[in-house]
A protein has these predicted regions:
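Hydrophobic ligand-binding cavity/cleft-lining segments
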Residues: 1-47
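Generic C-terminal helix-cap and adjacent flexible tail
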Residues: 2-3, 16-17, 140-149
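Intrinsic-disorder/low-complexity, polar/charged segments enriched in Ser/Thr/Lys/Arg/Asp/Glu/Gln
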Residues: 3-11, 51-53, 64, 77, ...
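Hydrophobic/aromatic beta-strand elements that line small-molecule binding cavities or substrate pockets
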Residues: 8-10, 41, 65-71, 82, ...
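Beta-strand elements of well-folded, non-transmembrane domains
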Residues: 12-14, 58-60, 110-114
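A short, structured loop/turn motif at beta-sheet edges
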Residues: 13-17, 44-47, 70-75, 94-103
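Short beta-strand segments that buttress and anchor functional surface loops
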Residues: 52-57, 78-84
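Beta-strand/loop substructures that line and gate deep hydrophobic ligand-binding cavities in soluble
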Residues: 79-133, 138-140, 149
Length: 149
């Protein structure tokens, strides 16, 4: 198994609450995460223990995974444990106010389970690029909604 630990961040010209309203809503993930194809909310409340199943495509492979909320401190922190899928570990969303709005960080830390034969050095660059692209889409959505609202 390959160990992965990467963090990607961007600045978004919006409040943490405006960002979290999109970022912490699993139903909106396909809007800002191109890899995510479907979302099935198993437990609708945003609270520890709540589960969501997703399907996605990454590096030419279709797969699904289930996350469980470990911690939520709206609108600043959402920590998800990956309960099953091709990757086990934790995804953390962190939103902190900044001079220009908010700094948004996504951290993925864990191990591959289904891609164990592929070294981390081959997984991390496309994963980092995918997260960076997702944060760019999130930025466009949130800043666009802010202008409309």
């Amino acid at each position: 198994m390959a160990s992965i630990d990467l963090t990607v961040e961007t600045e978004i010209a919006a409040s943490p609450a405006d960002i979290a309203a999109v970022m912490f809503d699993p139903q909106r993930e396909p809007e800002w995460m191109p890899a995510v194809k479907t979302v099935e909310v198993i437990d609708p409340a945003l609270q520890p223990g709540a589960r969501v199943k997703r399907t996605a495509s990454f590096m030419g492979t279709d797969f699904s995974w289930t996350t469980e909320v470990e911690a939520v401190h709206f609108p600043h922190v959402l920590t998800l444990r990956i309960a099953d899928g091709p990757f086990t570990g934790v995804i953390s969303y962190n939103i902190q106010r900044s001079a220009g709005g908010s700094v948004v960080r996504v951290r993925n830390a864990g191990e591959t389970t289904k891609l164990g034969f592929v070294p981390a050095s081959m997984i991390e660059p496309p994963m980092r690029a995918a997260i960076d692209a997702s944060l760019g889409r999130l930025k466009n959505i949130v800043e666009g909604e802010r202008v409309k609202g």
